[in-house]
Amino acid sequence: MRVRVLLTVLFLVPAAGCTAGDGEAAQSVRAESSFGAKPTITFPEGEPPADLQVGEQMTGTGAVVEAEDLVVAHYTAHVWDGADNPLLASSFNQGAPASFPLGQSLTGVSKALQGHRVGSRVVAAIPPEEGFGPNPPDGMAADSALFYVIDVLGAFPPEAAATGAGGPGTLAGIEVEGGPGERPVLTLPRTAPPGGFRSKVLIRGKGARVRAGQLVVTQYEGRVWGADASFESTWQARQPRAFRIGNGGVVKGWERALVGVPVGSRVVMILPPDLGYDKGLPPLIKPSDTLAFVVDVLAAY
């Protein structure tokens, strides 16, 4: 299932690499607020640095961010032009944090975050070749330097999985193998779909319950009923995904199955066509297809 990832356009542009500096220039920019709150940013006079400069204004105590992680963060980004330094974008203006896979992110952002811990505030002065390079967003020059303030809320490795209590289970002939911390194995029956919506929590997490409007981090596999192979799997792609639930960004069946489920849970669900892709998703899914999903709820923000 192709879910919409929030605000990733500000991170997901390839660029050439360089070595990070000691962060003196980045630290000279004042970013004032508590962690997780929109900062007030004051730039020094003069031009931005020519190389990548990274600093840490707050130090977290969570997991260390690794190169293949999906990162969830609040951020504010400016064009650092040495004059007006205009705001580029901020997750605080969108009502939810951003999510982005480091392996597909701006080179400067990826390098800046690796090695820092969840709960840290990272600041980065990013030169053009480590930012958008020759493909900047509309209204921004190709030679623009950037400045990011990033509050790291979470980091999720490719093997992240449900962590609650429970294990293998069945739903209307579907079999799901695998326990907490393990990748699930999904097997569908060779029978007609049961009709109607069904869902079942196989592993029940101990976290807060998912609320409509939150950004939810997941691992999942989706199958067309009767198919031997998945049409999409974050496990196979080695990349957890995040989406905003309750705003029409995912299929209706996901919203029905996941809102109210505790974080850390694994849910298996059967979606009739009207709760899945009722218009189809050619060439993978026809409008008449019933779908089966197994979803691990890793976090909600």
Residue locations for each model-derived region?
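Cross-family detector of peptidyl-prolyl cis-trans isomerase
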Residues: R2-Y301
